[in-house]
């Protein structure tokens, strides 16, 4: 056998192998029945993942040898299983884009058991009065907030605390423990009560001091006395006013000798009206 015959034998063997590969693919019965596909059109098969490699194979193959044919993907049992489930998923309704269904406003959907009420702190003027009345779970009071609630002391408790504060402005630890047990309170309550009571007492004391100073400093000033009268001795040295008859008081000579007569009186006073002497008759 020469070389030409060997070439033709190898070419014929290669053609037979390619023809075997080009043969129809066997049909598989693993796919679903045809009745399930009635009225449903499956999507087209995806493109080949390696189109460049297939084109290179077509270009590099001999002219008398056709390229390898890829069997249809629909005959693959895995692809048929995918087609069986894909239409069912496409038939499901699409979920809404937002958290609320179409035609519904955001404020309409609410929990049926939740009562819609305004803010609790807007319903009462007291800071902590709403905590005991509010039953909503969303606005339930926290454990930390319960510590800040105001303690309501009874009259008996206030009486004992006031009596203790009257004797001691600052309470000691043993006495505080004793009062807490006796009044059914905590040490913290008694400590805070004494702190507040001391602040109130200090404010009252400051107010009293400020009021006394204002009253003492704001009094009406007494009128000043005459400059001529400065002591009680000068008042005694001054003579009484003269009688209407023009007689000189007896204290005038004494005052004249001492040189302390007032300017209105002279040293030798003369009566205002002196009777004329009668001439003596000759005997």
Curated annotation (Swiss-Prot):
Molecular function GO terms recorded: DNA-binding transcription factor activity, RNA polymerase II-specific; RNA polymerase II cis-regulatory region sequence-specific DNA binding
Regarding how it is modified after translation, the entry says: Phosphorylated by the SAPK2 pathway at high intracellular glucose concentration. Phosphorylated by HIPK2 on Ser-268 upon glucose accumulation. This phosphorylation mediates subnuclear localization shifting. Phosphorylation by PASK may lead to translocation into the cytosol.
Q: Which compartment or compartments is the protein found in?
A: Nucleus; Cytoplasm, Cytosol
Motif (Nuclear localization signal) spans which residues?
A: 197-203
Q: What CDD domains does this protein map onto?
A: homeodomain (cd00086)
Q: Which Pfam families match?
A: Homeodomain
Q: Which UniProt keywords apply?
A: Activator, Cytoplasm, DNA-binding, Homeobox, Nucleus, Phosphoprotein, Transcription, Transcription regulation
Gly residues bias: where?
Answer: 211-220
> Residues annotated as region Disordered?
34-72, 201-283
Stored InterPro entries = HD, HD_metazoa, Homeobox_antennapedia, Homeobox_CS, Homeodomain-like_sf
Per its database record, what is this protein's job?
A: Activates insulin and somatostatin gene transcription. Key regulator of islet peptide hormone expression but also responsible for the development of the pancreas, most probably by determining maturation and differentiation of common pancreatic precursor cells in the developing gut. As part of a PDX1:PBX1b:MEIS2b complex in pancreatic acinar cells is involved in the transcriptional activation of the ELA1 enhancer; the complex binds to the enhancer B element and cooperates with the transcription factor 1 complex (PTF1) bound to the enhancer A element. Binds the DNA sequence 5'-CC[CT]TAATGGG-3'.
Q: What is this protein called?
A: Pancreas/duodenum homeobox protein 1
Give the organism the record lists: Pan paniscus
Name the gene that codes for it: PDX1
């Amino acid at each position: 056998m020469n070389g030409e015959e060997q070439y033709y034998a190898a070419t014929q063997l290669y053609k037979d192998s390619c023809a075997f590969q080009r043969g129809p693919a066997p049909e598989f019965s693993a796919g679903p029945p045809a009745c399930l596909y009635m009225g449903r059109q499956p999507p087209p098969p995806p493109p080949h993942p390696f189109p460049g490699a297939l084109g290179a194979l077509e270009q590099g193959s001999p002219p008398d040898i056709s390229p390898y044919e890829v069997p249809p993907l629909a005959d693959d049992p895995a692809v048929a299983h995918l087609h069986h489930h894909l239409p069912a998923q496409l038939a499901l309704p699409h979920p809404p884009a937002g958290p609320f269904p179409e035609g519904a406003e955001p404020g309409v959907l609410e929990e049926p058991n939740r009562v819609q009420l305004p803010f609790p702190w807007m319903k009462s003027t007291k800071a902590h009065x709403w905590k005991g009345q509010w039953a909503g779970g969303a606005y339930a009071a926290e454990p930390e907030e319960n510590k800040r609630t105001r303690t309501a002391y009874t009259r008996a408790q206030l009486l004992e605390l006031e009596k203790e504060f009257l004797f001691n402005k600052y309470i000691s630890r043993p006495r505080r423990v004793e009062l807490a047990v006796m009044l059914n309170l905590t040490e913290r309550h008694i400590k805070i009560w004494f702190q507040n009571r001391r602040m109130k007492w200090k404010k009252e004391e400051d107010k009293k001091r400020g009021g006394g100073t204002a009253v003492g400093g704001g009094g009406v000033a007494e009128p000043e006395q005459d400059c001529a009268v400065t002591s009680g001795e000068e008042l005694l040295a001054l003579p009484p006013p003269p009688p209407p008859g023009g007689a000189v008081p007896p204290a005038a000579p004494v005052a004249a000798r001492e040189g302390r007569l007032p300017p209105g009186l002279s040293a030798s006073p003369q009566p205002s009206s002196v009777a004329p002497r009668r001439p003596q008759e000759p005997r």
